[in-house]
């Protein structure tokens, strides 16, 4: 009985202690929750106080404006009415005018205060830039995940080499290709500051479309960052602006005056843009003048380069060489030895409806000629330099309709020696039998249609590039044609597949008996961008593109002519090879805010 009593008392004491402990823990938990709720309420009160202050300022603005309007009305009535007994005296009228002036000043100050408050709130919630030592830094760019599918392989990732899509006889034309890539991801930084009345700016932009010596798709898919743009700028209050560095060429169309960073580039995914788009990114030193945001005049000196294509020519000329190991140029690329930079002059107009541009290009092409290179005993004696000038004229026009939702534009560039400014990279020059350069006639045209809305962008482009032929029937020694686009060149093998050239499976055979020099490249492109989110946290963007591309070569003849003189009429056995690509692209991007 005693044992039972002891056990009962023990259980009661334990239960009591447990109950007290549990009650204590519950009380502490309730106190913590209450404290958190109090903090939340305080934060809510702060937000409500801020909103209330803004509303009060808005009400004050409305009241002040109403009072100012009423006082102004009274003053006007007093001024225009007839003087009657008890009417307002001159002193009273002057006092009323003074009151109106004071009310207007109060209204202006209140509006400024409201705008300043709203701006500070916006800057705190969503800062658009960083401030560092008196300058403003604005980061930008996007992260991209993109794919491309082509029915005929080009081995070129997310950009399409328009002048290299394969003819039907090429092995790569017999199978398709799919690639995924994040290399078009882009990073940029804009730095801005003021020096007195002068606006200073610097801009840097990069992507990952460069190729290193160890880059491949085997495992890590590591590709290198490259320079897209890097320039500095000084803008003066009198409308003059000076810009220097690597930038879009002044040839490239802009959407606002001649301002950098307003270039009218196609919206598509393909990193090589579209046929007919004229552009370059290269060193430039540019000076522009702005008259009242209506007329702009710009002039730039830019890096020069010569693109040459010639067939059948002897080795009696020189225009440059490959990069050297001790220098900073690519060992696998050719560089022309330029006598001078390229010169571009442009005028832009914005009369009130539309944006219009007229421009011209001038290029100096230099050659080292060896007149005795074709003798029975060749010698470099008597070699000399020779230069020719090339260039052209172009124009752009762009219009906005339907509350700026619908945008359309047209571009044209024509001349001689302007091939490299076209998107397809067609040649600038060829050579005659004696080694003299001859500038090739060329034309580039592009039409664009775009539809813009907060959620959707739709686009369509149609363009083409053409390069004329310049050829000569014989070369020193009396055999074969020389130049570009000759109907006597052999194109009979452009549709015949050849055997691989390597045993490792990565050596597609080169076409035999296929000169295949390009006459024109024509492309039609359409696509869309969808933006499920576009706000202070950035922009999410999804897109798709389809392109139809046709590359047509100059008519040729085969086999190679070995008689002198060559036949005046190549006959009915002429061949104009054609290559066609149907391409699909997809893109998933996140843009920095």
Task: Show the residue positions of the predicted features.
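Outer-membrane beta-barrel "beta-signal"
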Residues: 578-593
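Outer-membrane beta-barrel translocator domains and adjoining extracellular loop/strand segments
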Residues: 153-157, 214-223, 255-262, 309-335, ...
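Short sequence motifs at beta-strands and strand-loop junctions characteristic
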Residues: 176-182, 222-224, 275-279, 335-340, ...
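Sec-dependent signal peptide recognition
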Residues: 2-9
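Detector for outer-membrane/organellar transmembrane beta-barrel domains
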Residues: 351-524
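Outer membrane beta-barrel
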Residues: 125-313, 337-355, 399-409, 414, ...
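Sec/Tat signal peptide C-region and signal peptidase I cleavage site
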Residues: 15-19
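N-terminal periplasmic/intermembrane-space "pro-region" immediately following the signal or transit peptide
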Residues: 20-156, 499, 506
């Amino acid at each position: 009985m005693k044992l039972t009593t002891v056990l009962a008392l023990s259980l009661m004491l334990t239960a009591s202690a447990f109950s007290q402990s549990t009650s204590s823990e519950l009380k502490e938990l309730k106190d913590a929750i209450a404290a958190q709720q109090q903090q939340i309420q305080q934060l809510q009160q702060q937000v409500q106080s801020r909103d209330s202050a803004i509303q009060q300022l808005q009400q004050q603005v409305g009241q002040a404006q109403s009072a100012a309007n009423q006082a102004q009305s009274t003053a006007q009535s007093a001024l225009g009415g007839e003087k009657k007994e008890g009417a307002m005296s001159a002193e009273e009228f002057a006092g009323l005018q003074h009151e109106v002036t004071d009310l207007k000043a109060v209204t202006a100050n209140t509006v400024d205060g409201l705008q300043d408050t709203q701006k500070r709130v916006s800057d705190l919630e969503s800062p658009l830039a960083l401030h560092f030592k008196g300058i403003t830094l604005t980061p930008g760019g996007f992260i991209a995940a993109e794919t491309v599918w082509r029915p005929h392989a080009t081995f070129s990732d997310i950009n399409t080499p328009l002048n290299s899509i394969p003819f039907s006889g090429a092995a790569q034309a017999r199978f398709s290709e799919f690639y995924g890539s994040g290399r078009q991801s882009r990073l940029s930084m804009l730095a801005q500051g003021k020096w007195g009345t002068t606006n200073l700016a610097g801009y840097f932009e990069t992507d990952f479309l460069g190729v290193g010596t160890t880059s491949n798709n085997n495992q890590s898919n590591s590709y290198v960052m490259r320079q897209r743009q890097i320039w500095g700028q000084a803008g003066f209050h009198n409308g003059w602006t000076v810009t220097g560095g690597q930038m879009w060429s002044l040839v490239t169309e802009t959407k606002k005056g001649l301002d950098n960073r307003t270039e009218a580039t196609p919206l598509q995914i393909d990193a090589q843009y579209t046929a007919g788009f004229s552009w370059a990114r290269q060193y430039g030193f540019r000076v522009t003048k702005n008259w009242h945001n209506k007329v702009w005049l710009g002039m730039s000196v830019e890096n020069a380069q010569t693109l040459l294509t010639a067939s059948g020519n002897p080795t009696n000329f020189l225009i440059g060489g490959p990069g050297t190991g001790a220098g900073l140029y690519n060992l696998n690329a050719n560089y022309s030895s330029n006598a001078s930079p390229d010169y571009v002059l442009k005028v832009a107009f914005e009369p009130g409806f539309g944006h219009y541009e007229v421009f011209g290009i001038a290029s100096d092409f230099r050659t080292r000629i060896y007149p005795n290179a074709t003798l029975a005993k060749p010698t470099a004696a008597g070699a000399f330099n020779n230069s020719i000038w090339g260039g052209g004229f172009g124009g752009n026009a762009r219009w906005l309709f339907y509350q700026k939702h619908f945008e359309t534009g047209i571009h044209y560039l024509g001349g001689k020696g302007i091939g490299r400014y076209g998107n397809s990279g067609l040649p600038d020059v060829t050579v005659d039998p004696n080694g003299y350069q001859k500038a090739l006639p060329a034309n580039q045209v592009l039409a664009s249609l775009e539809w813009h809305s907060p959620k959707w962008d739709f686009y369509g482009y149609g363009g083409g590039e053409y390069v004329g032929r310049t050829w000569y029937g014989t070369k020193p020694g009396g055999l074969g044609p020389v130049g570009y686009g000759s109907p006597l060149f052999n194109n009979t093998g452009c549709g015949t597949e050849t055997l691989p050239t390597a045993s490792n499976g990565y050596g597609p055979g080169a076409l035999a008996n296929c000169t295949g020099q390009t006459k024109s490249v024509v492309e039609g492109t359409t696509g869309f961008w969808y933006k499920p989110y576009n706000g202070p946290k950035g922009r999410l963007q999804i897109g798709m593109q389809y392109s139809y591309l046709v590359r047509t070569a100059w008519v040729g003849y085969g086999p190679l002519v070995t008689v002198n003189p060559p036949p005046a009429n190549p006959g009915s056995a002429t061949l104009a090879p054609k290559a066609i690509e149907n391409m699909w692209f997809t893109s998933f991007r996140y843009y920095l805010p």
